[in-house]
UniProtKB/Swiss-Prot annotation, chain A:
Pathway noted in the entry: Porphyrin-containing compound metabolism; protoporphyrin-IX biosynthesis; 5-aminolevulinate from L-glutamyl-tRNA(Glu): step 1/2
Enzyme Commission designation: 1.2.1.70
InterPro entries: 4pyrrol_synth_GluRdtase, 4pyrrol_synth_GluRdtase_dimer, 4pyrrol_synth_GluRdtase_N, GluRdtase_CS, GluRdtase_dimer_dom_sf, GluRdtase_N_sf, NAD(P)-bd_dom_sf, Shikm_DH/Glu-tRNA_Rdtase
Presence of keyword Cell membrane: no
Name of the gene this protein is made from: hemA
Name of the protein this chain belongs to: Glutamyl-tRNA reductase
Length: 436, 267
């Protein structure tokens, strides 16, 4: 059995194509069922996010399976396959395993290390499990992908730094003020960006929020939303000393906070550090405020610079993540190959058992004066002969599976004993694995 | 035996310092872990070496420059391990361990014969004086290191340099906090060391205070600087940059006192 991946992502397709191919999560049942009803596709999972649409499936026929899934994608979304094909990529076997591990670990994301993708794959898998379109192989495969993602997250610092401006502001404030719990944030003006940053500060532990807006009512509304306190704009400088973090974004045509204002405030605060972010254009805060003792002023450009530096660091950490993925691929591949041999073992055993039963019945039928004791002994003897005969081939096959050389043995056995592995065997196998 | 442990210490401190210095340039969490293990192992070896020597001579190993420097180094590393544990600031090691290594290298270069100070000078006041002085020196060494780190980090923040070192250095508040805590440990000890030194000086047949003894005079200057710093912190809220600069000045004067001025009595 092989794992195949067919899909497209932000790397291969523009957004107009991605949105046409996307699957809606509440209507996912039908496409999932259609997918597993395709010829020789036994299991399927559909992952659909704004940056990627991918189908994970299992098949015996790699080329045919891949072609059928591509056709399915085109037909389902009513796009001619010829125009869709250029955006699609497909992987099978080891490359497919690598791809999914990388995607789950957020190594293939637009913003490397972003945490959403793992949740999105988990949700997609949840649907497949609910509608029973994923089976033994994809179940195990995706659980493995989740654990690889977890390893990458904990063993590298891929997600340790902020990659949005609002988060960068929080990170920067921590470098100055240390622990943010108990710190007070002041909003001057009520821009959207400020609001977002304030939200981040409050979820990061900051306690109080002061809002100074020219329109007092608007300031009051915003303050109420976050459980803060509105202050009249004219009293800004009387209240400024209460703020540890100041976010300013008024539409004022000139600066509203001058160095001497801040100097007085800093003295009043006994030089407790103050963190200023000026989001307004033109600026609200005189740049010379940054030269004052215990006052640290940053603009959006500064924050953007941090974001870029953090991105560079993430990309560096990503190479450590790639190493972890490579280690894990080998292990999973071994398991997948050993799976190949299991249905053969089951079929072989069934064939032997069938022969033993038939012969035993034939013998017992013509043997009238046999005591129940002797009958039991015969049963045990034949069973143990069968087990002894099967012991070595089973062990050899399992070993071969771990070394990835199963095809040779399973093919030979199938031919020699005329075995047919069926769907039923897979079910038995599943039971066996669940017991594990 | 104490020599064997002493050389073990030298090697372990050397390894730890190297690891901490590489950690400045390369961000590998594993490196910090190993540096910490090395310095901890070094500290244990150093402690054993010091205890062995004390048992051997029947006196605190603070009688010669060799012994004093070694003890100074031991106290620095002890203080570092304590603060590293409580604040989890690995990068502190990159600033502190080189100082401890320098002290122990200097110590190893000096004659290590066992000296017995004359019975007149043997007094609990002397031992108390020396012990407290060195522990306060160690505390001030940590203050010096965190002050230097503070100034560096502040420079990055004011000039908007967001490099790898900026990322590794802790927040200004944490460094200021460590500085302050060390000051509150170091200053009372230094005060007690000066007082017990004066009492001991009387016992040894001198005066409480001898203005001709340059070491005493410089100790007083050191004391005044740290007193001013503590006073400024407690009353007008001196902190951050101002406090860091004064701490560095205090440490420089302290080094002059320790190395530059010979004691009129013992050395």
């Amino acid at each position: 059995m092989n794992i195949i991946v067919v899909g497209l992502s932000h790397k291969t397709a523009p957004v107009e194509v991605r949105e046409r191919v996307a699957f809606s999560p509440n209507l996912i049942e039908r496409p999932l069922r259609e997918l597993v009803s395709l010829d020789d596709i036994s299991e399927g999972v559909i992952v659909s996010t704004c940056n990627r649409v991918e189908i994970y499936a299992t098949t015996h026929d790699i080329a045919g399976g891949t072609a059928r899934i591509k056709r399915f994608l085109a037909d389902h979304h009513r796009i001619p396959l010829e125009s869709l094909e250029q955006y699609l990529y497909s992987y099978h076997s080891e490359a497919a395993i690598r791809h999914v591990f990388r995607v789950a670990s957020s190594l293939d994301s637009m913003v490397v290390g972003e945490p959403q993708i793992l949740g999105q794959i988990k949700t997609a898998y949840g649907y497949a499990a609910e509608y029973r379109t994923s089976g033994t192989i994809l179940n195990r495969f995706l659980h493995k992908a989740f654990s690889v993602a977890k390893r990458v997250r904990t063993e590298t610092r891929i997600a340790s730094s902020a990659v949005s401006v609002a988060f960068a502001a929080v990170e920067l404030a921590r470098k100055i003020l240390g622990d943010l719990s108990g710190k007070t944030v002041m909003l001057i003006g009520a821009g959207e960006m400020c609001e977002l940053a304030a939200k981040h500060f409050l979820t990061s532990g900051a306690r109080g929020l002061l809002v100074a807006n020219r329109t007092f009512a608007k300031g009051e509304r915003l303050a109420a939303e976050f459980g803060g306190e509105a202050i009249p704009f004219e009293e800004l400088f009387q209240e400024l000393h209460r703020a540890d973090i100041v976010l300013s974004s008024t539409g004022a045509p000139h600066t509203i906070i001058a160095p001497r204002d801040v100097e007085a405030v800093v003295k009043r605060r006994k030089f407790k550090p103050m963190f200023f972010i000026d989001i307004a254009v033109p600026r609200d805060i005189d740049p010379r405020v940054n030269d004052l003792e215990s006052a640290y002023l940053f603009t959006v450009d500064d924050l953007q610079e941090i974001v870029e530096a953090n991105m560079a660091q993430r990309n560096q950490e990503a190479s450590k993540g790639e190493e972890i993925v490579e280690q894990e691929i080998g292990q999973f591949h071994c398991w997948l190959s050993s799976l190949e041999s299991t249905p053969t073992i089951v079929a072989l055993r069934a064939r032997f058992e069938e022969i033993r039963r038939a012969e035993l019945e034939k013998t017992l039928c013509g043997w009238k004066d046999l005591s129940p004791e002797a009958e039991k002994r015969l049963e045990i003897m034949t069973l143990s002969i069968m087990n002894k005969l099967l012991h070595t081939p089973t062990a050899v096959l399992k070993r071969a599976g771990q070394g990835g050389r199963t095809d040779l043995y399973t093919d030979a056995l199938r031919q020699l004993f005329d075995l047919q592995t069926s769907r039923q065997d897979d079910d038995e196998l599943e039971l066996e694995l669940e017991e594990e | 035996m104490s020599k064997f442990f002493f050389y073990c210490t030298l090697v372990l401190y050397g390894g730890a310092t190297l690891a901490y210095l590489i950690y400045l340039l390369r961000t590998t969490p594993l490196l910090a872990t190993w540096a910490h293990r090395l310095i901890s192992a070094g500290f244990i070896a150093h402690l054993l070496s010091t205890i062995h020597r004390a048992v051997l001579t029947g006196q605190l190993p603070l009688t010669s420059m060799h012994e004093s420097l070694s003890f100074f180094s031991l106290a620095i590393v002890g203080a570092f391990i304590f603060f590293e544990r409580s604040y989890r600031v690995a990068i502190l090691g990159s600033f502190v361990t080189p100082l401890a290594l320098l002290a122990i290298i200097a110590s190893s270069a000096l004659p290590d014969e066992i000296r017995h100070i004359s019975p007149i000078l043997r007094s609990n006041w002397f031992w108390g004086h020396a012990l407290m002085a060195f522990i306060s020196y160690a505390a001030f060494t940590i203050t010096f290191a965190t002050s230097a780190m503070y100034l560096l980090q502040e420079h990055f923040l004011k000039r908007k340099r967001f490099g790898a070192l900026f990322r590794k250095l802790p927040s200004l508040e944490i460094m200021d906090d460590i500085s302050y805590r060390c000051l509150t440990i170091g200053f009372p000890l230094l005060t007690l060391a000066i007082i017990s030194g004066a009492i001991w000086s009387v016992q040894a047949g001198g005066n409480y205070w001898n203005w001709a003894d340059r070491k005493q005079v410089w100790s007083m200057i050191t004391w005044f600087i740290y007193a001013a710093l503590l006073h400024g912190r407690l009353t007008t809220g001196w902190r951050g940059r101002r406090a860091a600069l004064l701490s560095i000045l205090g440490f420089i004067v302290l080094l002059i006192t320790f190395f530059g001025m010979r004691h009129s009595v013992t050395w």
